[in-house]
């Protein structure tokens, strides 16, 4: 069924077809189904809540003029809009809660400018392309997502938080997004530019605050990297190594700590890891190789070259770890949390307490990052295995960790505030009122509550467990 015949029930579809052409407006179920999935199925709660997501059409603008016209048309008809990049999000950021349109931003792509310390790109530009353009000038992105091969610029800053480079340069909020331009969702869209601290108003806001048209990101001098496995018999020693690595003069783009049995779930590299061992995934400057090895050995670690022919190291840390654990344990779940910052001894105490309380259940996966003032931050993305009653057990686990001083970031909600990343959203809500006066931009994701309305979990046995990179060609 074409968009034209579908428009008998939704007359506005004819206008989108007239604007973009029939091939750029999808409304047939099979064609739009891939736009109605992301990686929110990592959470059994969200998997259930978002199982029946539907949309009237997917529209695919190819440039800023077409994007602006699409937004204006949607505003005129008061049609709900959900912006979508590559669909690599984990919280249902780009899945619509109301009928309307999904706007596929990937066609609005291209590098706009590269200068010393900054790069500007259109919203649908793939992060890998941005990194390559930067490297062509002897620079690299300060931070990029582990899904950089497929993730878009606007998708990353709207739905992500940190990633590769955060070990050296911090997360998105660490002055790594320099400026953003967006258009308002009005019948005559206006352009608004945000710079400096004002950029924080749109970071990790799930595309609820304006439609992004330009992203400017921080660049730093390029490095040559080597990727290695550092194997440990003792996870606390692994944690001490990771902390000291990031706190040292060694330049690391990644320091990802994986407690056993997580390494055994990472099938492309398990043959290099003795059973029961813990692993640090390290992506560090080749010039610092000797110092990195000496540090690893001082904590009892064994450094191994990355297995030849194996999947690249960047497809194992951050939320990729949850993909591997869900493949190994299909009924597992996950959390996100932050351990003690700037206090190594307290961090180790928290690691020990969680291991003793939840052995084999709370599998500790910790990304060691930093902040602008060089404070070490320990971000947990743990798989949760064997929770008998998922929601009840999850609540108890969260309560225990909170009592230890571990700050919980809850990935089991599609509402910005309930995720825990952005804190007070008063200014964001005020900006949304200005840029989205009709409230049609990704409705239900900001200023709402999911936890109060959630229902019982029904686990699906039909999941597409391919990695984000494998889905990009569809």
PLM region descriptions:
Residues 16, 63, 74, 87, ...:
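Buried hydrophobic positions in well-ordered alpha/beta secondary-structure cores of metabolic enzymes
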Residues 110-112, 123, 127-128, 132-256, ...:
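FAD-binding subdomain of flavoenzyme oxidoreductases
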